[in-house]
Amino acid sequence: MPTNLRYQKGILLINSGFYRSAVRNLFALLDSEHKKAANAYEGIIEKKHSYKKGLQRANKIDKLINSLDDLWMETAWDKVNKYYAKVVSTNPVEGVIHRNSIVHGDYDKELIEVDEFSAAKLILLWLNLRLIADYLCNKEEILDNLLLYLPSLILHLKDNPS
């Protein structure tokens, strides 16, 4: 299912009051964006790696963000990463939706109870993570295009010095 359709269904579920179902959709979207952000620049400068664990992906994204010299992006990533770590932590964190309980079917009533406010916080987390992933992917595409056209530019400048 395309990401925008999954997002629309998540919003529709929240509007209809089906918060737990909406949150399940949002967890899939969060994982997708986290993987997309971690895969930026893979195979361009260094050998392509596969990041299976969330902590490995977070460390890769952290490394990318810190290399960009963009204060806003560093601040945004720091806040998003801290909240995302709470959401996906092994042990439940007070006041944060516990992903593992909902996704893996832990039917402890307290852990799977989702309210509108918590679902809205998860949407905002996804939107910000999407913004970061798109930013990294756009930068990657610019670098990829630059590397594609660089040899012809060098030859042109060599043949036509100004």
Q: For the regions a protein language model found, what residue spans apply to each?
A:
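Amphipathic, non-membrane alpha-helical segments in soluble helical-bundle scaffolds
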Residues: 19-23, 89-92
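Charged alpha-helical initiation segments
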Residues: 1-20
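Short, flexible loop/turn elements at secondary-structure junctions
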Residues: 14, 18, 27, 31-34, ...
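Short non-catalytic regulatory patches outside canonical folded cores
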Residues: 24-83
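Short, flexible/disordered secondary-structure transition segments
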Residues: 21, 40-41, 109-113
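Acidic, Ser/Thr-rich low-complexity intrinsically disordered segments
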Residues: 151-162
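Charge-enriched, short contiguous segments at helix-coil
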Residues: 81-151
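Residue-level detector of well-ordered alpha-helical segments, enriched
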Residues: 21-26, 98
